[in-house]
């Protein structure tokens, strides 16, 4: 028989009384009415804020973008397969935020800043709101420092400055991602933090980009944010804002950052899916009415900070895919109107073997020569005009049988200029080497060569200057000007090399 010991019972009661917590908690809760397709309808949650995070019983997190009269529409940040009708939901009182720190460099993360590269957790002591207001007018200054992409066609004719937003636009398979990744590779040793955001891409494509970065040693200054095509629409919608929050963390620490959004049209599609499921009224191409605001609030966060804020910068390169060259579609026109210029990639040029397939004639940078070093301005000033005239002349020459000598010379010069703009992938050039290349072509030194010999000769010339005339590179990098001394060294080197090259080719 069990004996009841009064002292034991009194001890237990005393312990329970001592442990009793008189703190009263008010929790804002609701009930799931309906769930499916990444959307949940919640009854209750009377005091929830727009955009507040809510937590379901089985620990899935959601965001509440739709506050209606009798229910709350919540988008789920997960598959939500375990959420049941009638289960409870509580408001967290927080808006979406992510942890941020230097430890994110070299890592691959998802839209919630959780690592997905299998290399363990990332330590951080700070956090930033995923959506934070863009810098105001007083917090900015005009763009004046160049951000070198390493691609001759861009750095000479469509220059990008630190703090600029430049759109990369073109059909599928025209090398848009290659232009962006080459720009990241060229930031090695430039003290620029890079963030590559992959939205709705194939996992294999993202893996290929990450492998390229690792092989070229670019991961040490790069963060990759990836939400692949099989991710929930909510996470694809959030990924660019996560990337921007990470870039902002470094920008406000007086660092220079570069963010690639690849690509915002996939984000717009994810947002359209969410909006239609939330029963928001559709507009043009079934996108919701605020799809312009979706991209403008993202890209306006790219800025060049004022002197008072330490002159950090965030340069944004959004990539938009067009359907058979139609740049007048809804999303392309929206992003063109938000950005400070665009780089058009043409499928025709790509198929003709001109890579990068940049259509220089219709590409533009609204910052212009303010984002170029003086040496580049001096040698590349007339290149864009010359190429445009050449393209016009080439079209005309197809119908003319006998051309005068001057026209033939102009066509020959144009063909060689176009040839020197060709570059292999993952082989960006330093600005000093670009100056050499453009000067050689623009001043007619390539005219005696066959078109097929141009690339080989330029490689030989750049190697010769690097090894035998290092003072040329020193003058350009220290003065940032194409001085008379630099020109004399270059002229001498070109004449020596062209004679040697022609002799070698003949023998």
Swiss-Prot record:
Enzyme Commission number: 7.1.2.2
Molecular functions per Gene Ontology: ADP binding; ATP binding; proton-transporting ATP synthase activity, rotational mechanism
Cell compartment(s), UniProt: Plastid, Chloroplast thylakoid membrane
PROSITE patterns, sorted: ATPASE_ALPHA_BETA (PS00152)
A cellular component annotation (GO) from this entry: chloroplast thylakoid membrane
Similarity comment: Belongs to the ATPase alpha/beta chains family.
Protein's job: Produces ATP from ADP in the presence of a proton gradient across the membrane. The alpha chain is a regulatory subunit.
Protein's name according to its UniProt entry: ATP synthase subunit alpha, chloroplastic
């Amino acid at each position: 028989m069990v004996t009841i010991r009064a002292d034991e019972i009194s001890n237990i009661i005393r312990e329970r009384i001592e442990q009793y917590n008189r703190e009263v908690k008010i929790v804002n809760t609701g009930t799931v009415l309906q769930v499916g397709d990444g959307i949940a309808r919640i009854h209750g949650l009377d005091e929830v804020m727009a955009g507040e995070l809510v937590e379901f019983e089985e620990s899935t997190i959601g965001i509440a973008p739709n506050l209606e009269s009798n229910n709350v529409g919540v988008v789920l940040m997960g598959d939500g397969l375990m959420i049941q009708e009638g289960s409870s939901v509580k408001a967290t009182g927080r808006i979406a935020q992510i942890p941020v720190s230097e430890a994110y460099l070299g890592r691959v993360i998802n839209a919630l800043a959780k690592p997905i590269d299998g290399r363990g957790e990332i330590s951080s002591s700070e956090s930033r709101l995923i959506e934070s207001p863009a810098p105001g007018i007083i917090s900015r200054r005009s763009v004046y420092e160049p951000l070198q992409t390493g691609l001759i066609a861009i750095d000479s004719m469509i220059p990008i400055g630190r703090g600029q937003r430049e759109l990369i636009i073109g059909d599928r398979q025209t090398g848009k991602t290659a232009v962006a990744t080459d720009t990241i590779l060229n930031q090695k040793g430039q003290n620029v933090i890079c963030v590559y955001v992959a939205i709705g891409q194939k996992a294999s494509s993202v893996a290929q980009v990450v492998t390229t970065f690792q092989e070229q040693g670019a991961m040490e200054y790069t963060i990759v944010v990836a939400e692949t095509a099989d991710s929930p629409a909510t996470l694809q919608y959030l990924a660019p804002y996560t990337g921007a929050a990470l870039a902002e963390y470094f920008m406000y620490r007086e660092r220079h950052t570069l963010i690639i959004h690849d690509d915002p049209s996939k984000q717009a599609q994810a947002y359209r899916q969410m909006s239609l499921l939330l029963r928001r009224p559709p507009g043009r191409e079934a996108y919701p009415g605020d799809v312009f605001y979706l991209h403008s609030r993202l890209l306006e966060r790219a800025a060049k900070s004022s002197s008072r804020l330490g002159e950090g910068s965030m340069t944004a390169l959004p990539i938009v895919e067009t359907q058979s060259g139609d740049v007048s579609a809804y999303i392309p026109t929206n992003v063109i109107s938000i950005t400070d210029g665009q780089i058009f990639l043409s499928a025709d040029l790509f198929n003709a073997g001109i890579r990068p397939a940049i259509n220089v004639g219709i590409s533009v940078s609204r910052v212009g020569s303010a984002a170029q070093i003086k040496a580049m301005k001096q040698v590349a000033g007339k290149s864009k005009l010359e190429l445009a005239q050449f393209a016009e002349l080439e079209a005309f020459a197809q119908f003319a049988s006998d051309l005068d000598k001057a026209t033939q010379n102009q066509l020959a010069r144009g063909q060689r200029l176009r040839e020197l703009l060709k570059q292999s992938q993952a082989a960006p050039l330093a600005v000093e080497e670009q100056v050499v290349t453009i000067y050689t072509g623009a001043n007619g030194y390539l005219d005696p060569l066959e078109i097929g010999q141009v690339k080989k000769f330029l490689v030989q010339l750049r190697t010769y200057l690097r090894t035998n005339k290092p003072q040329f590179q020193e003058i350009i990098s220290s003065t940032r000007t194409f001085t008379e001394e630099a020109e004399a060294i270059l002229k001498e080197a070109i004449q020596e090399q062209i004679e040697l090259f022609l002799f070698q080719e003949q023998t």
